[in-house]
Amino acid sequence: MPPRKSFWSGPKAGIIGVSIAVGLAALSWAGNNLGGASGSYPEATHKVTLPKTLLDGGYTLAQDLSEQGESALAGTSEADIRDAKAVVGQYTSVDEDGAGVLVLSGMYGRIKNPDSVRSSMLKGAAEADGATVAVPPKDIEVAGSDVTVSCEVVTTASAGGEKTPFAMCAWADDNTGVSVAEVTPKSVAQSPESIDLDAAAANALKVRDEIRKPIA
């Protein structure tokens, strides 16, 4: 059976649903589980967008879920973030052999403590129903970039009890905080420990370059 059919015919709906839930849980934690940093709020200079394609056209936007993201951010503490706006999208691969799913869940605003936002997003991922952190978060420095990306491996349990592993990465800066979860046939077939988090971090930075734009 071709990889695309085997991947999409069974776990597709569950994988998409749980990966979206994981992204929304991460977003909720980013806005509501921070400690309250000292100092002033940065100037708002950048925003997060939802382009029609990602990763050089490899993924196409299937759903704009930003309204659900706004609900996840409801009650966001202004102790660390001001003027927060949610941006959430689900993308699917345009490659017939790839059959990937990518969920982008983030926000933009004025972020006082980006490091806390980044770590909170990954902590929040484990709060989604059916999700477990199989490989704990680690900070990854990608060559050629001064942006710290944190990545972990999350597993989700299907109705049949099978676990689906995927990498989830997050970054945050003075204006943007985003998590990126990508599920592919390759990741589904791997053990959590064998998923390449360095490659996932590099991909997350490519996504960052494509979605983070100056405020006009």
Regions found by a protein language model. Name each.
Residues M1-G10:
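Intrinsically disordered, low-complexity Pro/Gly-rich regions
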Residues W8, A26-K47:
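C-terminal region of N-terminal signal peptides and the immediate post-cleavage residues
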Residues G10-V18:
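Short, hydrophobic alpha-helical membrane anchors of single-pass surface/secreted proteins
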Residues G17-L27:
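Core hydrophobic alpha-helical transmembrane segments of single-pass membrane proteins
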Residues E43, L65, K206-D209:
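Membrane-topology and secretion signals of cell-surface/extracellular proteins
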Residues L50-A167, N175:
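A small/polar (G/S/T-enriched), proline-flanked helix-loop surface module common
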Residues A143-A216:
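Extracellularly exposed regions in secreted/surface proteins, prominently low-complexity, repeat-rich
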